[in-house]
């Protein structure tokens, strides 16, 4: 059996119009980073922000107008590496920042996971940065992505395989 597709100019125009009507800045940004590999910034701050995003969004609403999204878009962001590296008790500070932004769900677990994960990053001298930067290479395989995601899943407290994949996707690496 052979199937012959005939696509007219009007078909193409209908699809183009549909896509243009449903454009979304979030989706456009993801396409720019994850497909075209542009505007990807991998550093300690982006890792910490993405880690926190994954911890916050595990079981909470996180649409574009949610408290989580508003918090994560703050500029300057209140939980940069420069700030938290000078804080005596990271867990308490993260809890305080989250509470001041009305992010009270799992208010004990999330700061504890964040502090533990930061300690892991520090103890390993941020080896994770090298591992995830390797995903910026041109010829990355799905197997390499899976190895890095599995490493994140096993290393970060409060993470599972879904959070590990979301983490890499949010950074623009998958």
What do these predicted ranges mean?
Residues 1-112:
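Structure-specific DNA junction-binding interface
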Residues 2-12, 129-136, 146, 172-174:
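C-terminal extensions
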Residues 77-157:
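Alpha-helical ds-nucleic-acid-binding substructure associated with the helix-hairpin-helix region
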Residues 70-74, 117, 170:
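Short acidic/histidine-centered micro-motifs embedded in hydrophobic/aromatic stretches
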Residues 155-157, 166-174:
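Phosphate-backbone recognition surface of nucleic-acid-processing proteins
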Residues 58-68, 121-129, 173:
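Short helix-capping/linker segments at secondary-structure and domain boundaries
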């Amino acid at each position: 059996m052979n199937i012959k597709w005939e696509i007219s100019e009007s078909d193409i125009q209908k699809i183009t119009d549909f896509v243009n009507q449903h454009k979304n800045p979030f989706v456009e940004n993801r396409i720019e980073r994850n497909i075209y590999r542009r505007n990807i910034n991998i550093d300690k701050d982006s890792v910490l922000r993405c880690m926190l995003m994954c911890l916050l969004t595990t079981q909470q609403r996180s649409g574009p107008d949610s408290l989580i999204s508003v918090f994560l878009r703050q500029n300057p962001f209140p939980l940069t590496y420069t700030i938290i590296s000078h804080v005596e008790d990271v867990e308490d500070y993260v809890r305080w920042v989250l509470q001041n932004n009305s992010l009270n769900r799992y208010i004990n677990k999330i700061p504890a996971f964040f502090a533990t994960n930061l300690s892991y990053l520090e103890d390993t001298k941020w080896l994770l940065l090298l591992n995830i930067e390797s995903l910026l290479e041109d010829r990355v395989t799905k197997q390499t992505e899976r190895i890095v995601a599995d490493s994140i899943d096993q290393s970060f407290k409060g993470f599972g395989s879904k959070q590990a994949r979301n983490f890499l996707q949010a950074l623009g690496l998958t």
